[in-house]
Amino acid sequence: MTPLDDPFRTVGCELAKIPTDVKVIFVDMHAEATSEKMAMGWHLDGKVSVVVGTHTHVATADSRVLPGGTAYITDVGMTGPHDGVIGMDKRGVLQRFLDSMPARFVVAEGDIQMNTVLIDVDESTGHARSIERLNFRLD
């Protein structure tokens, strides 16, 4: 999908609108490409408290605090059915891959997973101290 505007230029304009006394800034980078999310993390390192990637529904294992004090993860994951493909019933998704025909996806049933992160931020500086992935399975 082609963006309406370059997110790397746009984020600078949006950050400039935030009052200078605001120290804790959270950015949700909703994108398909992991490389774009990683580049945004580096671009914003030291300028924001947190960059969390979303969209793919698959939690990544690369959470860390970057050198400038920005907590980062490429994709936090999702909250939804565990035994499916990104929350959808696996049979329909597999059939679409196997026959290359459009198919309506149905939400999977069963156990629920919740992926999230716990981030500790110094409120006086806005720098992250830590980021921890948390994954829960709910029956």
Question: Where are the predicted features?
Answer:
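Short, structured patches in soluble enzyme cores that scaffold and shape functional sites
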Residues: 29-31, 135
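Binuclear metal-dependent hydrolase catalytic cores centered on His/Asp/Glu-rich metal-binding motifs
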Residues: 1-24
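Conserved active-site and cofactor/substrate-binding residues in soluble primary-metabolism enzymes
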Residues: 2-10, 39, 92, 111-114, ...
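A short C-terminal boundary segment appended to hydrolase-like catalytic domains
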Residues: 93-139
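Divalent metal-coordination and catalytic microenvironments
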Residues: 26, 55, 119
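Conserved beta-sheet core of the metallophosphoesterase superfamily
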Residues: 34-107
